Amino acid sequence: MSYLIKNSKITHFLTYRFLFCLFLISLTSCKTDKKLLTAQQIIDNSIKVSGVDKVHNSTLSFNFRDKKYIAERNSGVFVLKRISAMKDLQIEDQLSNQGFQRLINSRASMVADSMAVKYIESINSVHYFSVLPYGLNDNAVQKKLLKSTIIKGKKYYKVQITFNEDGGGVDFDDVFIYWIGAEDFKIDYLAYTFHVNGGGMRFREVRKEHLIEGTRLLDYNNFKPKDTNTKLSDLDKAFENNKLIKASEINLENIKITFN
């Protein structure tokens, strides 16, 4: 009788050990899977979670500072507009697959090439940031996964974005870094270099999210480094250590979106 009881205890013990080992293997496997995500997979997940994949066929309008912006997208065909009013004049700048044009009171107006380049940069920049991470799967985009980091106690994937010269636009040599939540795949921070107006770096912190028709659009606090020698990849550390200066706020207002 005691022999049977002893064997029963051994059997239960071995069964427990076996199940516990299976649990550890499963847990380790899950953690390993997360570590093995590629930059492409992380961006894909972020686009899906943010709902901006639907922007591909939509009309989006919003106000930014003193201008109105409208983006019409239809399966790769796009028209990006910036509209401003001055007294009796309405100026509408358009950037599309066909190029750039300016309309003044609905009539085409000539623009010097040197000025057109500046207008294109400005229009493209506002529309680009307004729907992030949409656009991060464009053909010209190159993705690189950097070392994960923690900001304010939250773990982030760190993805660097660069662009091919062919298809990367006039600012193809800009570099971006996105901090994407390791659990929720939301962009909470981003940083970038720029070369216009003397160049520099900026670090953006999401200050508010707008959920419009299932699409996550963002407002930001915009920072610049106190030390101009700070590396772009170290701006997250500079942010945590209060070594950034708030330069501005990026707020989208009167947001409307309809899907085709």
Map each language-model feature to its residues.
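Short, hydrophobic/aromatic-rich segments at coil-to-beta transitions
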Residues: 55-61, 75-81, 153-160, 187-189, ...
